[in-house]
């Protein structure tokens, strides 16, 4: 697997592989491209990113973006026009790169992919089950980061 010089993949106990910044990034800077092909839910792997009601970006190859873990206080967002991961704020070298899975995934329970979040942020959602299970208030807080298909169902 190719890992760009500006990124580093490290195995973390209890999390698996995690992606880290190998240099400083400025807010709004593109970190990396979300690669793969569009598949239906029935064909997608657990690492796929949901971009539509039944559309997932997935690949038969392992890409470095598969190592981006969830956080309720993420450092990255997906720019859905360019399909790039973009810095939400300034990121320091050595910091873990994360995005909020609730901004793309509608129902993780359906495929038994829900999990207890370990991000430790004060705004932690706890059990990550998917956008479907959030309160209206929680959904509205995530609105600026949401995949377009989720914005439509708000």
Model features per residue range: what roles?
Residues 1-154:
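Conserved catalytic SET/PR domain of SAM-dependent protein methyltransferases, capturing the structural core
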